[in-house]
């Protein structure tokens, strides 16, 4: 059983993932529940992990994972279960982590199917997906930070303003896409950096979400 504060912390994580596609930071959790000390927030996260409600891997850039099966063992025991019950095992999908993508200079995306990330289908929607680990800081003003994992839906075209993973001479980069009159602009979300202009580019997919280690 969770006490009121533990339940509040868990609910903040769930709601943030539902609304934004990635978990809140320790600071954001603290602000949401009225805790000014990051160490206190970490202690609550540790308790939730020990009780089987969360799983974290401090060695990898993964988001906090809410363990649905632990809650669903006794559906009447916890008020959050009704919100989480729709994430059944049948709705979980394994998404390959292909390597790194630069949010800065283009960087080769090395395919590595040995690593996978499991996500609820309701988070991803339908389609073919892969994930990439972000390096560089050119997308920080869009909330994409070094070490984040971006969730990418495979598609060959995107709309103006979409954040895309583009292939430039066999190197992948994540930028905001704009098709202009006689060129394509790959726009960083960092006011200190300049856009990349090209005549043509291969689109690998659209960034539809991200995960962050906290």
From Swiss-Prot:
Keyword Hydrolase (UniProt): yes
Organism whose genome encodes this protein: Desulforamulus reducens (strain ATCC BAA-1160 / DSM 100696 / MI-1)
Keywords (A to Z) from UniProt: Autocatalytic cleavage, DNA damage, DNA repair, DNA replication, DNA-binding, Hydrolase, Repressor, SOS response, Transcription, Transcription regulation
Protein name per UniProt: LexA repressor
Protein origin, superkingdom: Bacteria
Entry's family note: Belongs to the peptidase S24 family.
Gene3D superfamilies membership: Umud Fragment, subunit A, Winged helix-like DNA-binding domain superfamily/Winged helix DNA-binding domain
Catalysis: reaction(s): Hydrolysis of Ala-|-Gly bond in repressor LexA
Positions marked as site (Cleavage): 103-104
EC number: 3.4.21.88
Top-level enzyme category: hydrolase
Active site residues according to the UniProt entry: 138 (for autocatalytic cleavage activity), 175 (for autocatalytic cleavage activity)
GO biological process, alphabetically ordered: DNA repair; DNA replication; negative regulation of DNA-templated transcription; proteolysis; SOS response
Function statement: Represses a number of genes involved in the response to DNA damage (SOS response), including recA and lexA. In the presence of single-stranded DNA, RecA interacts with LexA causing an autocatalytic cleavage which disrupts the DNA-binding part of LexA, leading to derepression of the SOS regulon and eventually DNA repair.
SUPFAM superfamilies to which the protein is assigned, alphabetical: LexA/Signal peptidase, Winged helix' DNA-binding domain
Complex and partners: Homodimer.
InterPro entries named among the record's database cross-references: LexA, LexA-like, LexA/Signal_pep-like_sf, LexA_DNA-bd_dom, LexA_repressor, Peptidase_S24_LexA, Peptidase_S24_S26A/B/C, WH-like_DNA-bd_sf
DNA-binding residue intervals: 26-46
